[in-house]
Structures are given as C-alpha cells and as structure tokens.
Regions:
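N-terminal low-structure segments adjacent to metalloprotease catalytic domains
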Residues: 1-147, 274-319
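Metzincin-family zinc-dependent endopeptidase catalytic domain
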Residues: 18, 46, 51, 85, ...
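Metalloprotease/metallohydrolase-associated module, dominated by Zn2+-dependent proteases
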Residues: 163-218, 234-319
Length: 319
C-alpha cells in the first residue's frame, strides 16, 4: 500500500497558481470558500484526504499520468466553458427498459437531478430513448462470463468514456450490480450464444438489475466523473477525488463522490457557481426522497449518508 502525499507548498501552488492574474481570481472567493478550499493545506484538515494506492492494479500505477494543476487547466485552450446556447447537459438513454421501465425511468430522473446539483448552474435534460441498433455500436459476448458487452477498442471493459472535443460521454451501469460478477448472474446469455454481428435482437428485453442504493451511488460517481472530462478535468493526481481514475470496481467504491479543492476550483471557474449553493443543492438531493407523483418509490440514499454528513461539515465551515 502507498499513500501519495504532496508537500503543502506543492498543493498550494496547484490550487492557487503562481500567475498573478490567477492569484487575483482566487482572492475573489469568500473567506468561507477559501476556508474549505484550503482545508487540504492545514495539518488538522478534516475534509480532504491523501490518495491511497492499494495495489499495482490501481489506476495511478497502471496508467501513469502527469499531475494537472489549476494553472494548466485554465491555460488549456480546449477546456469547455458554458455560454449562451451551450449550457445544457443532455442524458440520452440507449435501449429499452422493458417491464422495468417505470422504476428505471425514476432512476434516470434521480441521476439527472444529481447531475444538475453536481454541475450547479447548468440545466440537465433527458432525451427520449433510442434503440441500441440506431447507435451502430459493436458488441460481443464475454467468453468467460457469458455476459453481453459493448465493445470499447483497446479496453477489456470500461465503466465509461468521454471526449472533451466531442462534448460527449458514454456510461454503462451493468457492472454496478452487486451480482454482476456472480456465476449465476441473471443477465448472462446462454452458454455458446454467438449472436451475429449486427444482430441487435439480443438486446431485446435484456436483464435490468434492481435499483439499489449502492448501484445509484456508483452511477452518480461515474456520471459526474465522465461529464467532468467534458469540461476538461483530467484524472486527479492530487487528493482523493471523484475525478481519480478507477481501474476496477473496488477502487471506484473506495473513492469519494466529492471533488478535491483543486478540481473544485477548476469546475467553479468554468461554470461560475457559489460553492455553498452547490453544496446545498447536493445535500438537498441526498435528503429528498425522490418520489414522483403517482409512483410509490423512495430514492434509495442509504449509501449517500456519509456524503451528506461531509457536505454538512463543508457548509458549517463556510458559515
């Protein structure tokens, strides 16, 4: 196990910058906002933690990348900044949910609401579903698990992929079902199944896992992470952060839902929200039962309670 701890001087430079204009921008934050952002610089800080690498299969040792500080982010000419006519995030579902449509549509709505709180100040809308066939995607059946997979070139699997230049991301939640890796997983195809290329009928009435609190939490993580890439946020190397890369499910599970101070400043500089307003919106999402008129379904937020307490500590520090 390895703990990656950066010197305070290095963290301060990554957060605030050495450029005079960016230092002046930083000084525009309120005292409360700076207190939260600078918690990582204090020896008694309670909000942010150093990155822990548990094994060589974790993302950082498996995929070495450069650290990307605020100044590098702000200087990137390709970073995305919302503007008039381009300030909406769209969620497009792919495939039919069949008999599970009622509850799955609620799940998509909860994701939409979370995304709108996370990217506070932007509008998030859902688009009508499209068929898998209409995407023309490549797929395969995993020879070991008999699970159906959408094929991503050069990867054996992905939780999600996003493109800054295209402003688009694709996320899959099948692996977030606790039973996905079990031998009796309900979504397995029959042994020996070999659908022909282009035969998308295999997706008809495909298994939809139950919407649990753990699945919802994992889904919120991957959505916020991949959409972050669309804004130019690269994989975080500084502190525990939702923008850290994840090479496997166990690594993803131990990561936080929150942004570290450096990535938070990057996102805030792009969107322009008040940090307290964003935290309040996220806390409201955690506390809201998520019910919809005429539908008896409570949003399963048990797995989010620790996150809710963290948000409350942030808000208390800013008062």
């Amino acid at each position: 196990m390895q703990i990656i701890e950066h010197p305070v001087k290095k963290l301060r430079a990554a957060l605030i910058s050495s450029r005079l204009d960016l230092i002046e921008r930083y000084q525009q934050y309120s005292d409360g906002e700076k207190k939260v952002l600078e918690d990582c610089l204090r020896p008694d800080g309670v909000l942010f933690r150093a990155i822990t690498v548990r094994s060589d299969s974790d993302w950082i040792p498996a995929h070495p990348e450069e650290s990307y500080d605020f100044q590098s982010f702000f200087s990137n000419p390709y970073r995305s900044t919302p503007c008039k006519g381009h300030h909406t995030i769209y969620i497009q579902t792919i495939g039919s949910f069949g008999e599970a449509a009622l509850h799955t549509n609620l799940y998509v709505e909860w994701l939409r609401q979370y995304c709108e709180a996370f990217y506070y100040g932007l509008v998030v809308k859902t688009l009508p579903p499209v068929t898998v066939q209409s995407t023309g995607c490549t797929f395969r059946v995993n020879s070991c698990s008999n699970n159906l997979q959408l094929y991503a070139e050069s990867w054996n699997f992905v939780f999600g992929q996003a493109s800054l230049t295209e402003g688009m991301g694709v996320f899959s939640f099948a692996r977030y079902d606790d039973n996905f890796y079990q031998r009796n997983y309900a979504g397995q195809l029959k042994k020996g199944s070999k659908p022909k290329p282009g035969d998308y009928s295999v997706f008809n009435n495909y298994y939809i896992p139950p919407i649990t609190s753990t699945l919802l939490l994992r889904s919120c993580k991957v959505v916020s992470h991949e959409v972050g890439h669309m804004f130019g946020l690269q994989h975080c190397q500084w502190l525990q952060c939702v923008m850290q890369g994840s090479n496997h499910l166990e690594e993803s599970d131990r990561g936080p839902l929150s942004l570290c101070p450096i990535c938070l400043r990057k996102l805030q500089s792009s969107i322009g929200f008040k940090i307290a307003d964003r935290y309040k919106a996220l806390l409201q999402w955690v506390h809201d039962d998520g019910g919809s008129a005429g539908v008896h379904a409570v949003k399963p937020t048990e797995a989010f309670q620790e996150y809710g307490q963290w948000l409350q500590r942030c808000l208390a520090m800013m008062e």
